[in-house]
A protein has these predicted regions:
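Cytosolic catalytic headpiece
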Residues: 4-188
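Conserved catalytic-site loops of classical short-chain dehydrogenases/reductases
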Residues: 1
Length: 188
């Protein structure tokens, strides 16, 4: 933060609340895949489908997935479109594919007890979750996390010492993800 001029600095001394965006401000801004569950007999094709679609996206989570998967055979995608609320649909090898947050799973996708438990575990851990279904069959669940900046907690403590009463964390991420980062930083 850069403050210029004595009036601005004086006015800033009366600030009692500071709102921070999470991604790239309090976290490093480079999410990484921490967990991957596959529910398919053909993991090679499944990972190629995932990589082929995610390579078309500039979303930070898509970039993390592509990096994690490494080089994969690229399959032609058709009828690709972004889903409002967090996902993408496409047709690959004549099959309908949906990738995104849990909301992209249609009601036709029936989760096994293992899949439901894996999703619940990642949600409870505060991971950002990306799922992929092919023809309404869940095939991939990914847990993705961004690391808190090493000096963020100390900087927040300094703001408190300077008299800032409230430090607020703002994010469009899943509530559990935001809670995990807030706990790590000592925010309430």
């Amino acid at each position: 933060m850069l403050l210029k001029g004595s009036e601005v600095i004086h006015d800033f001394s009366r600030v009692d609340t500071v709102v921070f965006d999470k991604t790239g401000t309090l976290t490093i801004g480079h999410p990484e895949v921490t967990t991957m569950h596959l529910y398919t007999d053909d993991s090679e094709t499944t990972l190629s489908i995932l990589s082929s679609i995610e390579k078309e996206s500039d979303h930070p989570l898509a970039k993390a997935i592509v990096k994690h998967l490494g080089p994969q055979p690229i399959l032609p995608t058709e009828k690709t479109h972004v889903l409002r609320g967090g996902g993408i649909q496409a047709v690959v090898n004549g099959q309908r594919v949906a990738i995104g947050n849990r909301s992209v799973l249609s009601t036709a996708v029936q989760l096994t007890p293992k899949q439901a438990a894996d999703l619940a575990e990642l949600e409870e851990a505060g991971q950002s979750i990306v799922v992929m279904s092919v023809e309404n069959q869940l095939q991939v669940v990914l847990g993705i996390a961004d690391q808190v900046r090493p000096n963020a907690k100390a900087h927040l403590a300094q703001l408190k010492q300077l008299g800032v009463k409230q430090l607020v964390l703002l994010s469009g991420d899943h509530a559990k993800t935001v809670e995990r980062v807030a706990q790590e930083l000592g925010l309430t």
